[in-house]
Amino acid sequence: MHILLNTLYLMTPRTLVRLDHETVKIEVEGELKMQIPLHHLGSIVCFGDVTLTTPLIMRCAEDKRLIVFHDQHGRFKARVEGPVSGNVFLRHAQHEALSDSKKTTAIARNIVAGKIRNTRQVVLRGAREADNEDDRKALQETARELAHGLDALSRSPDLEQIRGIEGNAARHYFATLDRMVRVNREAFKITHRNRRPPLDRMNALLSYIYALLLNDCLSAAEGVGLDPQIGYLHVLRSGRPALALDLMEEFRAILADRLALTLVNRRQIDERDFVERPGGAVHINDNARKEIAIAYQKRKQEEVLHPVLNRKVPLGLVPHIQARLLARVLRGDAEEYLPFMYR
């Protein structure tokens, strides 16, 4: 359990949360674990087997404190709100921001800055762990290109230029991604990103993990009360969760790509876990999907330092924190969206 940005996050199975006068009491299997004055909380977010008593739910609804329920995998299930919700004002601000090019450009620029910086951290780590000088030099060159992208980003005045810088950084990155594959490289060779359908094993693996990550970012946006389809970096299209795609950019390399590389390099996944369909599409078999999903959930439990909060939090909570930071900017409670910077 964590309290971040006036939000109580409950993740421990068999947790009971009840209201005792003006104090929220948290018990796990009958043992009192934490007591929090109710006025310290703005919202409560539950994951998995967490029970809130009716008096607490009713009081939160009365006070306009948001309660959000996710399943144990982080999928959004429900929100409990009082009769008059502040979400309508948040969503109005979210839509209004589309006509404010200065605000949307600033948000998009910082999202891309977070993505490129985090990607560069992964590349630099790959260079340090490289088995040979050729791989090390190639990855160091990619890191330099990503640094140039960050420098260009600070001078980019409009959204199209920002998107162009992001796309160029992604091309450099994927051109050398397989340099970080240390075992069975030929079976997991990748030179560029392809999807719908993926045409090689690494792209199939990345697509599956990206789908898991997108689901988490959808849940983060919905849990805060944002419209997942109204984003600022990705182009708006009918049925496309543009905001969730925006949120996930900061986490692609550090969560999804690092996990894919770890699974391959530790031989937890190999070529036998994939099936090639007629036409060249490559799919992951069901057993491997289960193993990958389990590994993904474990990765989300690892703690990382959040630079804005200056404290360690589970990696799986960071998309939820970022969604709340973005909501603060849209409401006017903060001037700038600060992306998550991985260390």
From Swiss-Prot:
Mn(2+) binds at E166, H234, E249. Its EC number is 3.1.-.-. CDD domains: Cas1_I-C (cd09721). It comes from the Bacteria. Pfam families: Cas_Cas1. Its cofactor is Mg(2+); Mn(2+). InterPro entries: Cas1, CRISPR-assoc_Cas1, CRISPR-assoc_Cas1_C, CRISPR-assoc_Cas1_DVULG, CRISPR-assoc_Cas1_N. CRISPR (clustered regularly interspaced short palindromic repeat), is an adaptive immune system that provides protection against mobile genetic elements (viruses, transposable elements and conjugative plasmids). CRISPR clusters contain spacers, sequences complementary to antecedent mobile elements, and target invading nucleic acids. CRISPR clusters are transcribed and processed into CRISPR RNA (crRNA). Acts as a dsDNA endonuclease. Involved in the integration of spacer DNA into the CRISPR cassette. Gene3D superfamilies: CRISPR-associated endonuclease Cas1, C-terminal domain, CRISPR-associated endonuclease Cas1, N-terminal domain. The gene is cas1-1. The lineage of its organism: Bacteria, Bacillati, Bacillota, Clostridia, Moorellales. GO terms for biological process: defense response to virus; maintenance of CRISPR repeat elements. Belongs to the CRISPR-associated endonuclease Cas1 family. PANTHER family: CRISPR-ASSOCIATED ENDONUCLEASE CAS1 1. Homodimer, forms a heterotetramer with a Cas2 homodimer. It is an enzyme of class 3 (hydrolase). This is CRISPR-associated endonuclease Cas1 1. It comes from Moorella thermoacetica (strain ATCC 39073 / JCM 9320). Disulfide bonds: none annotated.
